[in-house]
């Protein structure tokens, strides 16, 4: 059946009515927790194990819709902050659940990449709510460092990643690696280099090998 009603639908979203979902028998949260537990038990003593979740901003976009959420920024910012409080609390509770199993957390903020939003929006609505999660994880658990991940050229957002407390970033092939290196120097931040996905789609090993070589050269010393 289709969705006939939704508390965040329309011009006056009922954010206060949203409840934070909990683990229930057979629901997705339980399935995720069980899967993470199995992986940690199997290989957690050999490698870092990360569990993935949507970051607070991306969760807010999924709930409200991108166009409506952006419109809310200009109509009533307090409405957006109220929703971000909810999604950040959801992320904190889910991180608790996964970190207790021995996994680190990846916060995927795919909806926060440029040019979907600009750096000012990122600073006000992405940084503080992701920082709430990363600080919580760092304070309570001895697990792999929390990661904030998104695609695209992250060069202009590097300072904000540092402010948000990430311990790992994904750096696309087209980023300014010298600038990234300058911002991560002396900090415990892992930089994960990413080749152009189109090179992988084409399936030509020679061009892919060349792309990997260029990426390795650009990231040398990080």
What are these regions (language model features)?
Residues 23-222:
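Active-site loop segments of alpha/beta catalytic cores
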Residues 1-22, 38-41, 45-46:
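A contiguous, low-structure linker/loop signature
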